[in-house]
Amino acid sequence: NMITPFVFRSLLDEGVLRDVEKVKKRIEEEHLRASFLNVKLGIGGIREIEFFVQTFQLLYGGGNKQLRLAGTLQVLQQLRQSELIPKQDADTLEKAYLFLRRVEHHLQLREEQQTHTLASNIVQQYAIARNLGYLEFEIEKALQHFLSDLKDVMGGVRAIFSGLFSSKHLEIEAAIH
């Protein structure tokens, strides 16, 4: 409770906004080097969803106590209910988060270690695809379906994350004045 006023400020200055934008740019630059095969740190991955959600917590958590939650999915639900982000974006991020976490968990179970990267080996990719329910008879079709879904999910996250400081999602200028 003592740190709440420092984390969830009732008023934000432009310096905080600039700092958040700098972090977003740094994440984007680092992700450009990462492959889409990394479901956590790659472009459109879990980290981008978490950063997106945490940015809204930082910006609006001071005035909206319902956003002061630890879970990404719970905060997404509150952002949807508070109409701070479009329902469609909240739905996309929620589905993507669940899908990417499932992929991540299957990767970690298969590798028996903490990993977030899908192997470039087709046999290993197919094994993950089958574990996730991509059960087409032909290996190539199952793998193609899984990789297509993965690209679509991560592309949807990326599109929303890229628009974080656009008028599509926030009237940030109004929030800090």
Question: What is the predicted role of each segment?
Answer:
Residues 1-177:
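A nucleotide- and high-energy phosphate-metabolite-utilizing enzyme signature
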